[in-house]
């Protein structure tokens, strides 16, 4: 191969741009396929680098390949002595002018080496074509014989109403309707195995957004609402694509699932080109999490599928059990007490540590069961006792999870080391089991953190939609927010009313007025009558009783708390410039019977 010759920066930059464009025009991401590095460079030299002055060396060419495909993997394929490095996850486009030549060279090299160099199984041109068609056309959705409909997509009407109250009502309502329909359509098309329509749905939705809608979607609280809907979308896709990684599915199916998730991400990022950076970052974070979770589950599924085959082999599992018992019994594990003890002040024997107990439970279970689900449930039970139950909050959980994972990894690695040094025949089976146990613990811990984040978002929804009070006043004195079907949120320039609170109790004793708090929650307009409504919360901290009301402006309401205290709330309009105008969600203490 020719080495690159010195060139001026300008000519070098132009040369690199040409190579990058050549890579983009002729190669694409294709999960499950690989391209030999030497063959890719050979085609480049034959087609683009015929002049020595216009060639780059293989190292520079490899850097440019990774610049175009940053997530590209590398695999060494072939038998011992004739293995070659491959770029894993890309393939030459069928529309490429060099496609036929590439297939010819691929078959030629395969025949000469006596190996199947590429990930494809066939050296001839027609079979390579057939395999690529299989990859592209294989649907990653299993047919549902029951034909069950897509899970209901949960709307957040009160949350939407809060945002509409803060911004333009019509624009928020329109955006929420459009976005939810967009998510539902994606789920329905995936359920119907119409994956080719998903790209069009994504592109058409984002490219049809007007500038005012885009700016609204970029606001922090609106992004949070849309993130809630994205969470439901991705959760629904995961449940349809791969609900359980222990389910028996084909390797080709797993490849198709990974390919679809990666394509989904590319479709979304492509549709978001030109949008505000903050919106792109938000959507990138959400879709990256979706791709990461599916990749983790497909990886686990692949390992579980292989491990099940090992567990069905009585000879292999017998060797594994005897070798593990021998290693534990002979004390050949190279384990440092300091590593297992961590922050513990008392010394214990290595066998008495929690991680050793967890491993001991697995070894004992192998004596009676070869069901992979039972083995993994054993790990889950130990995690529940050692990590989940002792955690008082999220910080404690993260600390305990990190500590367990570190010690668990160290322990399993020590077993692998002992297996290697003692030349155990079951090393291959243990190595697979080792990887599966590591990934499964990571899956459980990361899934818990993700679910907790989802629960936090769900709690926010519940908080915004909660119209229940500790003490219910007379129904004639108030109108609950959810009981106003004709109400819509007022625009932001609605005048804030003045709220006055008067104490009317006949008791002669001290009344503890400082413990009563009146909070203005929001403003509404009844479109049917044109009346202004104010949502307020009256709370007595001493008795922990509260009343949540939606009151019309210009009227009084008589409120009785559970301790017998009675109050009159009067709401009146004031000019916008008045110093007594109260902002939304402001707290105020009652002093002298009036709201200051």
UniProtKB/Swiss-Prot annotation:
InterPro entries: DNA-bd_RFX, RFX-like, WH-like_DNA-bd_sf, WH_DNA-bd_sf
Alphabetized Pfam families for the sequence: BCD_RFX, RFX_DNA_binding
Superkingdom assignment: Eukaryota
Annotated disulfide bonds: none
Broad class of where this protein is predominantly found: nucleus
Cross-referenced PROSITE patterns: RFX_DBD (PS51526)
DNA-binding region coordinates: 19-94
Family recorded in the similarity comment: Belongs to the RFX family.
Full protein name: DNA-binding protein RFX8
Gene: Rfx8
């Amino acid at each position: 191969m020719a080495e690159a010759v010195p060139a001026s920066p300008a000519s070098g930059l132009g040369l690199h741009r040409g190579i990058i464009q050549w890579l983009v025009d002729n190669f694409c991401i294709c999960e499950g396929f690989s391209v030999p590095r030497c063959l890719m460079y050979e085609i480049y030299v034959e087609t683009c680098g015929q002049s020595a002055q216009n060639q780059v060396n293989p190292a520079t060419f490899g850097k440019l390949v990774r610049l175009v495909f940053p997530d590209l993997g590398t695999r060494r394929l072939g038998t011992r002595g004739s293995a070659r490095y491959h770029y894993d996850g890309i393939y030459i486009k069928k529309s490429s002018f060099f496609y036929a030549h590439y297939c010819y060279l691929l078959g030629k090299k395969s025949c000469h080496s006596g190996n199947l160099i590429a990930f494809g199984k066939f050296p001839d041109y027609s079979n390579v074509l057939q395999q690529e068609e299989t990859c592209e056309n294989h649907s990653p959705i299993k047919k549902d014989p029951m034909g069950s409909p897509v899970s209901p997509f949960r709307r957040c009407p009160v949350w939407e109403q809060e945002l509409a109250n803060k911004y333009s009502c019509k624009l928020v309502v329109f955006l929420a309707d459009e976005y939810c329909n967009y998510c539902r359509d994606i789920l329905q098309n995936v359920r119907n195995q119409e994956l080719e329509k998903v790209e069009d749905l994504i592109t058409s939705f984002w490219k049809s957004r007007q500038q005012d809608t885009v700016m609204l979607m970029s606001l922090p609280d609106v992004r949070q609402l849309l993130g809630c809907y994205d969470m439901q979308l991705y959760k629904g896709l995961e449940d349809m694509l791969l609900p359980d990684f222990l389910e028996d599915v084909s390797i080709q199916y797993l490849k198709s699932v990974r390919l679809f998730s990666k394509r989904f991400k590319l479709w979304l990022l492509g549709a978001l080109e030109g949008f505000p950076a903050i919106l792109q970052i938000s959507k990138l974070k959400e879709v990256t999490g979706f791709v990461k979770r599916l990749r983790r589950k497909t990886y686990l599924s692949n390992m579980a599928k292989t491990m099940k085959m090992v567990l069905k082999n009585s000879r292999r599992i017998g060797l594994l059990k005897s070798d593990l018992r021998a290693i534990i019994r002979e004390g050949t594990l190279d384990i440092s007490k300091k590593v297992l003890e961590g922050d513990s002040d008392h010394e214990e024997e290595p066998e008495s540590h929690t991680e050793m107990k967890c491993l001991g439970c697995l070894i004992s279970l192998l004596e009676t069961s070869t069901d992979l689900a039972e083995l993994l449930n054993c790990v889950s039970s130990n995690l529940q006792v050692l990590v989940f139950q002792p955690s008082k909050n999220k910080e404690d959980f993260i600390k305990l999870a990190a500590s367990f994972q570190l010690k668990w990894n160290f322990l399993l690695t020590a077993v692998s080391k002992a297996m290697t040094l003692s030349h155990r025949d079951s090393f291959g089976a243990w190595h697979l089991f080792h990887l599966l146990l590591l990934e499964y613990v990571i899956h459980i811990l990361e899934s818990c953190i993700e679910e907790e984040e989802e629960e936090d978002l769900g709690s926010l929804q519940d908080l915004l939609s909660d119209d229940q009070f500790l003490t219910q006043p007379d129904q004639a004195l108030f109108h609950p927010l959810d009981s106003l079907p004709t109400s819509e949120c007022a625009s932001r320039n609605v005048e804030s009313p003045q709220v006055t609170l008067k104490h009317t109790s006949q008791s002669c004793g001290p009344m503890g007025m400082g413990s009563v708090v009146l909070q203005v929650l929001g403003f509404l307009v009844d479109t049917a009558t044109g009346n202004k409504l104010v949502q307020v919360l009256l709370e007595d901290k001493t008795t922990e009783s509260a009343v949540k009301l939606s009151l019309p402006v210009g009227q009084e309401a008589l409120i009785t708390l559970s301790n017998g205290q009675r109050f009159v709330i009067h709401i009146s309009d004031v000019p916008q410039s008045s110093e007594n105008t109260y902002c939304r969600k402001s707290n105020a203490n009652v002093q002298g019977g009036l709201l200051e």
